């Protein structure tokens, strides 16, 4: 018998409103992982929140990952119960990551 860890995990997913990001969010919700869903389209974030919020706790962040200032502001705005992030899915389509790791 496999025993699953009972502590709730939290995942932050960029580019969560479509494609791989949306599929990952759905899978994680089905695995009882709380979600921080990030995207540029608020209406899509709202749809996901309505669909997956029945399964797990969800917090949405509407911003563009290409702006470091917007990223910092969004992460700083997280409620206390979402500040500990266990899993990061850096999926946003335009997050090229061209800067060196120490400055990115």
Predicted regions and their residues:
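Aromatic pocket-lining residues of Rossmann-like dinucleotide-binding sites
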Residues: 28
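Conserved mid-core segment of classical short-chain dehydrogenase/reductases
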Residues: 72, 95-104
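N-terminal Rossmann-fold NAD(P) dinucleotide-binding loop
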Residues: 21-22
């Amino acid at each position: 018998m496999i025993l699953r860890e009972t502590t709730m995990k939290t995942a932050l997913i960029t580019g969560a409103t479509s494609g791989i990001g949306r599929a990952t969010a759905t899978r994680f919700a089905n695995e009882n992982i709380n979600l921080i869903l990030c995207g540029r389209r608020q209406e899509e974030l709202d749809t996901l929140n309505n669909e997956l919020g029945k399964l797990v706790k969800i917090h949405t962040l509407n911003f563009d990952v290409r702006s470091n200032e917007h990223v910092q502001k969004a992460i700083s705005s997280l409620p206390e119960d979402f500040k500990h992030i266990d899993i990061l899915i850096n999926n946003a389509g335009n997050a090229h990551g061209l800067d060196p790791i120490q400055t990115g």
